[in-house]
Amino acid sequence: MTASKSSSATASASDRPDRYDPIALEQRWQSQWQQDDLYATRSPEPGQNAFYALSMFPYPSGSLHMGHVRNYVITDVIARAQRMRGDSVLHPMGWDAFGLPAENAAIERQVDPGVWTDRNIEQMKAQLARLGLSIDWSREQATCHADYYRWTQWLFLELMDQGLAYQKDATVNWDPVDQTVLANEQVDSEGRSWRSGALVEQKNLRQWFLRITNYADALLDDLDLLKGWPERVRTMQANWIGRSIGAEIDFRVSDHDDAVITVFTTRADTLHGVSYVVLAPEHPLVATLTAEHQRESVAAFRDLVGELSADERTADDRPKRGVPIGATAVNPANGESIPIWIADYVLAGYGTGAVMGVPAHDERDFLFARTYELPVKRVIQAAGTSDHLSDGEAWTGPGILLNSGRFDGQSSEEARQEITAHGQELGWARPKRQYRLRDWLISRQRYWGCPIPVIHCDHCGAVPVPADQLPVTLPKDVDLQGKGGSPLASLQSWVNVKCPSCGRDARRETDTMDTFMCSSWYFLRFADPHNTERAFDADAVERWLPVQQYVGGIEHAILHLLYSRFFTKALRDRGLLNIREPFERLLTQGMVQGVTYRNPRTGRYVAPSEVSDENAPKDPVDGGELEVLFEKMSKSKYNGVDPAAVIDRYGADTARMFILFKAPPEKDLEWDDADVEGQFRFLQRLWRLIESVRSDDQDQLLGDPVDPPEGSGLSDKEGEIRRAVHTAIEAVSDDLKGDFQFNTAISELMKLSNTLSGALPEASRAVQAEAVSALIRLLAPFAPHLAEEFWFSLGGQDSVHKQPWPLHDPAALVRDTVDLVIQVKGKVRGTITVPADCSKETLEELALASDVAERWLEGKPPRRVIVVPGKLVNLVPS
């Protein structure tokens, strides 16, 4: 059934309520839209544009918060506007459903994590439905369901066959609370787990990795293609990839014929200033090169460093510590003997695990050398300066070489190339690119994740599970509380299998995948959600992708967004895709913040219910003054706002309007109950405006054919109405493109409603029909329920959300008269109304004949008259 004038959801003139009752109205239209399958995705017709609007799908916690609301409402407005513009729109939703929160909740509540997750999904779907989102729920996906993670496993095997998935022993970040491995990106700047907050430990385990580093150059270079992404996100990814162009330098170890320490440097021009070499404490050469008299201190230092995370070791504000190992190396540039140290700031997993120390030209090396009284040798001076080094600083910029033998007098840029080439001839240097990016560690030692489809055989090694045996499903009856390893390892009936290759006894892989594996391709599945033969069809993907508009938080700039780009490129190389990038445009919405009351002396947050005077808040415990701040909403800060409570009181349309109006989408939004009330009052005013038209027995205003208004036959008031209508159409249309200024679009709707409120009832039927039709259609993406109600109440045929987006008429914007500013000596002294098509000569005559000129010129002719047609006349007295 198609929604129409006779639809059961439509209130007739007799039974329509006389006041705005959003709850009943919204429930009625949500039910009707679901019955009509209004938002089902239709394949694009020939010549029709396909538009894919997508929000980053949520973890199903069971509770919708205001951050969710902002994300999904923003995407919904974009999807609705594009649908009205004639595009075929794909706007799906799913659930990022694996992960530690569900497993931890299951342990705490003694419930199966699958049951827990499915229950949460249903709760959140019901909450989302109340927002009136134009989502095609027939394409819904949940990453924890076997019909989805079957294809995650299949894609893993594709990557494995490409050589992009591999296993190796590695020192990894271990979360002692969640008992699992973390990728580098999941450890914060304080060395804590991104989820549990525990201090991360270092542990040596055999782990699965993906070779994302194979795509480092492509991931970096193709950032230039992403013109529709925020510059901040592109910069964050570029910095994370961290491409450095330089050289590898070999330092031969004294008295160890075969031992060579290789370092990477971008400053080969400083090579003659190297006064020591530093190894990572974990570097394999440390054990063989350490002198006997230094073994005890080296061992103690290594134990100390082992307790620190990588971020702690490299933090700029932390003193750098080290110990000498009792061995020396030879500087290949000048043959000088230099000591070998180990230090906490050098990481085994980054670069070669060794660095050269140039104290005179690196701030970190300078501080380290000063701490341990190591030599400081200057080999670069700034152009045009004397050879002088301040005691308290290093010169880190380029300059002219000195104390560098044959390279003295060369510029840094020239010397970098010359020294590298010289070393390459002699066999101790070679050009090199290095990256900060590390391969993606995907192993997790937890139950609630996608099983890795590999079987380990003593004879055959790591054997892929055959594709026809997928999915490898998660077993039931697993002890989730086991510590120190994967819970799956404890279930022998699941672990012990036959090798698919040789038939001998073998064991399943018991690690599960990082949840980002599942979210790195879900946008592809939405394009072909019911395919049982493959993860997706390339033609279906090409029809919809890249995603034209992706919406999500800035916190995913490196993790999810980088991994998704990697997946897309790897699958393209595999021949499974034809696209180069997954997301054409990206909008990173700001946080939703609520007011907090904090005791600055104790750090304690006080609930608003405990604050007796909001104007002078005091802590009820110690009576001290409280700080009043706006911070990200959270339970611990007592500043959360329940979306359900807002909808129960004001309706979803008001919640949507507030979220969109309060701040530009990329900025943080400060919650304000008064502004929510203000949006509710605005919608009530719109209700009264539409009622004022209907009260004149015009409930078929949008149903009966009406000739469009013609400019020549319009009254001045009707001309003003048309100008206001078409000004709003132009402005709102512009605001719903590019940077999406929803707040200014709603401001335009407010202006239009103010103009129409007094003038519309007296206008002709044609002007009324045009104005009301445009107003309702412009409102539809923002307040979809109320717009639908208005549309049908005035006799509109079919849903307003199927109507074409209004187009502005440039002719309607042309005014018959304009207000001309009169200036005297450059200062505004008044205005006059003149015909819009006046010549400069006529404007001058009218200005001189005006009361303004008579008053300020005192009857004297001006020395000069400056005319700016349509804007102003400036009179310069004689």
Swiss-Prot record:
Cellular component GO terms held in the UniProt record: cytosol
Disulfide links within the chain: none
Biased composition (Low complexity): 1-14
Disordered: annotated segments: 1-23
Protein species of origin: Synechococcus sp. (strain WH7803)
HAMAP family the UniProt entry points to: Leu_tRNA_synth_B
Span of the annotated motif 'HIGH' region: 58-68
Swiss-Prot/TrEMBL keywords: Aminoacyl-tRNA synthetase, ATP-binding, Cytoplasm, Ligase, Nucleotide-binding, Protein biosynthesis
Statement: the UniProt record of this protein carries the keyword Ligase: yes
Locations listed in the record: Cytoplasm
Keyword field contains Glycosyltransferase: no
Protein name in UniProt: Leucine--tRNA ligase
Alphabetized GO MF terms: aminoacyl-tRNA deacylase activity; ATP binding; leucine-tRNA ligase activity
The gene coding this protein: leuS
Location of the motif 'KMSKS' region: 632-636
Swiss-Prot/TrEMBL catalytic activity: tRNA(Leu) + L-leucine + ATP = L-leucyl-tRNA(Leu) + AMP + diphosphate
GO biological process, one term: leucyl-tRNA aminoacylation
Source species, domain of life: Bacteria
